[in-house]
From Swiss-Prot:
One Gene Ontology CC term in the entry: Golgi membrane
Transmembrane parts of this sequence: 72-92, 114-134, 144-164, 228-248, 263-283
Function according to Swiss-Prot or TrEMBL: Golgi membrane protein involved in vesicular trafficking and spindle migration.
Family: Belongs to the TVP38/TMEM64 family.
Top-level taxon of origin: Eukaryota
UniProt note: domains: The VTT domain was previously called the SNARE-assoc domain. As there is no evidence that this domain associates with SNARE proteins, it was renamed as VMP1, TMEM41, and TVP38 (VTT) domain.
Keyword set includes Hydrolase: no
Membrane topology of this protein: Multi-pass membrane protein
Protein's name according to its UniProt entry: Golgi apparatus membrane protein TVP38
UniProt xrefs under InterPro entries: Golgi_membrane_TVP38/TMEM64, VTT_dom
């Protein structure tokens, strides 16, 4: 009897040690992730180096965890992007001239607005891509104008509503799978469930998630109404002027022969991209904070149940 009790106590102790060790390891990684920079007096340069190394390790680990065919696809895409960048650097003048010629031709066609509208409408459905490129192309054709904004706004709003409706009613199971594709999508879903308002949806639409996938993922969140989603889409249309601005600066870059004007156009494009990235990053980190909070809450609940 005593031997049985000692064995049971020993096994329970081992389990408790394992559990404490597991939690300790998890807490260690949480500290390393969130509090490392606050624990040590690092300079700005050291902080930047640390962040770059940590991001590189995460990226490499994520890449190595992919199946072989996905790794090959990633390498192929990176190679294609590198070749495209080199071609753009070498033949940038002729490419810009060709782009300007095509944009002027498109502007003269009466049916060009319908082409842009339909293309933007259809890329709203996951897993299609090309939204940013199409909006920037509209800026090349129409510049920063009400006409250009109206075309891409109608395509964006109506396309997103259509994709949301289809995935909410017909492809609901696929929409729920989209949420589970990424931890950040799950955090997004949690935020929407807690705060079902068009303001929150509008803010989350500015996060750096793929445009079409976000339409499908939001449709998988219970309680989100088409009304609130539609209002949120309308509220986020002013940001589309940024794409038009970038497209118009690209066109000016090809048309201008002045070095000062070209420099101004390049700086304007960089500023616009930085502004978009900064806004998206702020909202992204807010979403990440929410995700970490949920993780801590789940861990506390798990500890309570095991206790």
């Amino acid at each position: 009897m005593a031997d049985h009790y000692e064995a049971r106590t020993s096994s329970q102790g081992a389990l408790n040690v394992d559990r404490r060790t597991s939690i300790s390891n998890e807490n260690f990684f949480d500290i390393e992730e969130e509090d490392f920079l606050d624990m040590y007096p690092l300079s700005a340069r050291q902080r930047l180096i640390y962040q770059c190394k940590r991001s590189s390790r995460k990226l490499l680990n994520t890449f190595m965890d992919l199946p072989l065919w996905k790794r090959a696809a990633v390498l192929l895409l990176c190679g294609g992007a590198t070749v495209s960048a080199l071609v753009m650097m070498v033949f940038h003048k002729s490419i810009l001239e060709r782009m300007i010629k095509i944009s002027n031709e498109l502007r003269s066609w009466w049916y060009t607005p319908f082409i842009f509208f339909l293309l933007i409408f259809f890329v709203s459905f996951p897993p299609l891509i090309g939204f940013s490129m199409l909006c920037t192309s509209a800026g090349l054709v129409y510049g920063v104008s009400f006409k250009g904004w109206l075309i891409i706004s109608l395509g964006t709003v109506l396309g997103s509503i259509a994709a949301f409706s289809v995935f909410k009613t017909v492809f609901r199971s696929y929409a729920e799978r989209l949420i589970r594709l990424n931890d950040k999508f799950e955090a997004l879903a949690s935020i929407l469930q807690d705060h079902n308002s068009y303001w929150i949806i509008a803010l989350l639409r500015l996060c750096p998630f793929p445009y079409s996938l976000t339409n499908g993922a939001i449709a998988g969140v219970y309680g989100i109404s088409i009304r609130n989603f539609s209002i949120a889409q309308v509220l986020t249309t002013p940001k589309l002027f940024m794409y038009l601005f970038i497209g118009s600066r690209l066109k000016n870059l090809g048309e201008s022969s002045s070095t000062a004007t070209k420099l101004f156009d390049i700086l304007s494009i960089l500023f616009a991209i930085i502004a978009l990235t900064a806004t998206a990053s702020i909202l992204y980190y807010k979403t990440k904070e929410r995700y970490l909070e949920l993780q801590r809450r789940n861990q506390d609940r798990f500890d309570t149940l095991n206790f």
